[in-house]
Structures are given as C-alpha cells and as structure tokens.
Amino acid sequence: MKMADTRIHISSSKGVRLLALMLLVATHTLAQPRLDEPEIFLGAYGGATASTVFFNPSVPGMDDLLKVPIGWNAGLVFRYGAHKVCALQVEAGYVQRGWREYSSRSGYDYTRTLHYIQVPVLSHIHFGGEHVQGFFNLGPEIAYCILSQESGTKQTESTYQYRPIDHLFDWGVAGGVGLYGMHRKAGVFQLELRVHYSFGSLYNNSRAEHFASSNMLTASVNFAYMWQIK
C-alpha cells in the first residue's frame, strides 16, 4: 500500500510541475513583440485518435501498443493572436478515448470506449515563412465523459476494470506539433500531431481500492481549417 501512495504523489507532483511550466510559457509569450492589430481565427478540426490507459497494477492484455482502440475527434477552434510569434488557442470538441485488452492465447478481445467533451486552452507558438509555418501547442485540457461503451469478450484474470468509471471529469496536459499554410483569401489549413496525458484517474485510488492509478494517454492526428475573421 505504501507503493501505491508513492505513485499517486509522483503523478500529482508531475502535474503541478507541468502546469507551472505552462504558466512560464504563457508568461514568456506575453513578452513577445505585439501586432499592430490582433488577429482572430475561427474554424473546425477533425481527425483520428489512438488511446490507452496506464493501470497500476497493470491489466493483462494491454502490453501491445499496436493493438489500441482507434477513434475520432472533432470540434471548433478559436485562435486569438496579439503577438508576432504566439497566440492563444481555445478548442471545444468531442473525442473518443479508452483502452483495449487482447490475448489470442486466452481468447479475449475487449474494448472500452469513453466519449468525452473536451476543452483545451493552448499557447500557440509559430515560426517560419509568410505562407507556410511550423508550430507547437501546449496547455491544460479539461474533459467530461458523457458516455461509456463496452464491446468484445472480457477476460477472467482481471475484472476490476469492468466496473463503471468513478470519475467522469478529467484534466491533464496537451501538446502538439504541426504545419499550417495560410492564405488571406483561402484561409488556414493546419495539420497537427497531438498527445494528451490525463492527470486524473478513471477509478478511485484510495488505499482501499484496487488501482493506485488509472491515467489515460491519447494521441491524435488532426486536420483543421480556419478562417481569419479579423
């Protein structure tokens, strides 16, 4: 039980340190040269996701990262830029997350799909030429689970994870890199690879519970189109 408490403390400490780092990034962006007039973009995004959950203790059948559930995400994006190399990007959308347990030897193949409404608030740093630029995004993200679905055959070796999740609210950090092309008349076309890590656990992690931690990791490839409205 002492090991479980240590792992929880480490996870929380990492979360605090990352949030502090994001605050420093945001503070640094405010010190950048300002534009004569702020730029405002509004658009939509969509793409594919791959996700898993890091259970402690581990769940059998989840060690093959090539056998993770594939889902999708989509939503709206708003970007406000008052500086030459950075902006604030806020999104609101839907995302599928979850995990898969698979074993050809034992004959089970189970998938839990969790449907979330997510809201990332990101510092957007861009660099490059006038029409084609690279960028990276970093910031906190909150999400709320609106639906949980199960499919496939369950295993018998470990069954605690088949309970309904205890925590519908999730929070974590998101970071991404990508490229975008911008044209005054055609708008902005953006391609991004993003990773999200949840600091919140799906299940209760007190001393009396089975799991010391149950944190999600989600990767996504997204395409976005934005129109400059100002």
How should each PLM-predicted stretch be described?
Residues M1-P38, Q228-K230:
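Cleavable N-terminal export/targeting peptides
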Residues Q32, D36-I40, A48-F54, R79-T153, ...:
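Gram-negative (and chloroplast) outer-membrane scaffold detector with strong preference
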Residues D36, L66-G71, T111-Y116, I165-W171, ...:
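Short sequence motifs at beta-strands and strand-loop junctions characteristic
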Residues T49-A74:
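Surface-exposed strand-loop-strand hairpins of Gram-negative outer-membrane beta-barrel proteins
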Residues P60-L65, S104-Y110, E157-I165, S206-A212:
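Extracellular loop and loop/strand-boundary signature of outer-membrane beta-barrel proteins
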Residues G71-G75, P120, A174:
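Short, hydrophobic/amphipathic alpha-helical packing segments
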Residues P164-D170, G175, L179-K230:
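Predominantly the C-terminal beta-signal and adjacent terminal strand-loop region
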